[in-house]
């Protein structure tokens, strides 16, 4: 298991990733990727799961997460506007460019990302897994797919289009506590029902 925790500006960001039992038994690499960066009171948190049937899925997920970090930097540097369409277009472009010498369909991956800029938390999702945000009695939950472990999810691939992404904005009162959670399908399958029917207080 790989874990990372960082504290800054009143934020606590934690990431945990572990290789699945099937991949461990077959001596295959961990296809999950996760990363975050904090810049002042703003941050990006991203998690990606390589689609198991693709031979370079771990590379696809790694570059999906890295693309989120690069897009966050573009936003902070005011190179692109913090609008959903711009963020999604930039993510797709960054992912494709980073894999320019690869067959994109060998590198398929899902993606869940949270971009927090100022008082707006923008969530971006393609494929299975889910994102949940909660603050002051308000909750946001991304759509979920009922195709657990089937390798039949929407994903970053050669045919990916902006309309394949789900996006939403969550407006924060930054003086009040909030929690944000994003995970891949392995965790989502066990938690999504609970998040759908219960408020989580932190």
Predicted feature residues:
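PP2C/PPM-type serine/threonine phosphatase catalytic domain
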Residues: 1-202
């Amino acid at each position: 298991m790989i874990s990372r925790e960082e504290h800054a500006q009143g934020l606590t960001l934690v990431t945990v990733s572990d290789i699945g039992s099937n991949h461990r038994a077959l001596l295959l690499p961990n296809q999950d990727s996760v990363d975050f960066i904090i810049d002042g009171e703003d941050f990006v948190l991203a998690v990606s799961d390589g689609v198991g049937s693709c031979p370079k899925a771990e590379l696809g997920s790694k570059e999906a997460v890295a693309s989120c970090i690069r897009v966050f930097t573009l936003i902070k540097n005011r190179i692109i506007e913090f609008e959903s369409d711009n963020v999604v277009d930039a993510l797709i472009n960054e992912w494709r460019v980073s894999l320019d010498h690869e067959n994109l369909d060998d590198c398929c991956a899902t993606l869940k990302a949270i971009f927090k800029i100022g008082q707006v938390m923008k969530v971006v999702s393609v494929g299975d897994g889910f994102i949940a945000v909660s603050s002051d009695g308000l909750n946001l939950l991304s759509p979920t797919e009922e195709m657990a472990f089937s390798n039949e999810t929407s994903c970053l691939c050669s045919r990916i289009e902006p309309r394949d992404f789900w996006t939403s904005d969550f407006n924060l009162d930054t003086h009040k506590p909030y929690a944000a959670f994003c995970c891949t399908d392995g965790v989502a399958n066990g938690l999504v029902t609970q998040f759908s029917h219960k408020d989580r207080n932190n």
